[in-house]
Amino acid sequence: MKKIDTLANDIYDLLENGTKSPKQEHLFAMASEIVDSMKKQLWTGTTPSKKGKLRMSNIGKPCTRALWYDINGDEKAERLTPQTKLKFIVGDIVESVILYLVKESGHTVTDQQKEVELQGIKGHIDAVIDGELVDVKSSSSYG
């Protein structure tokens, strides 16, 4: 069983040398995740939410006013700009591709997008890789 400390090098090795037999189930899972992301951003992510819930992903917001509006809603909330929606789509795609490469490089991925709850606050974890909880992030040097 592989360990997470070799993960980056194993992915780079896969990218450099390829594989003779990519696992179809990994490819189909990645494609399905990307389709789901597009549906979420294009069809269900087009309007601001009326009223939300306290979630693990928003609990750490430094602005308590923004957190209040996340939970209580704001009829005048700004719609997401096309540029912001594109960032969310790219982030979702990057997560799907990275987790595909993790699997294809021989590492164990479990609990993808598993819902968790702590003291009544719900959230989703990105994945557990080789027994380690991970959060997949994409970033740009441009801010």
Located regions from the model:
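Metal-dependent nuclease catalytic cores that hydrolyze phosphodiester bonds in DNA/RNA
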Residues: 1-133, 139-143
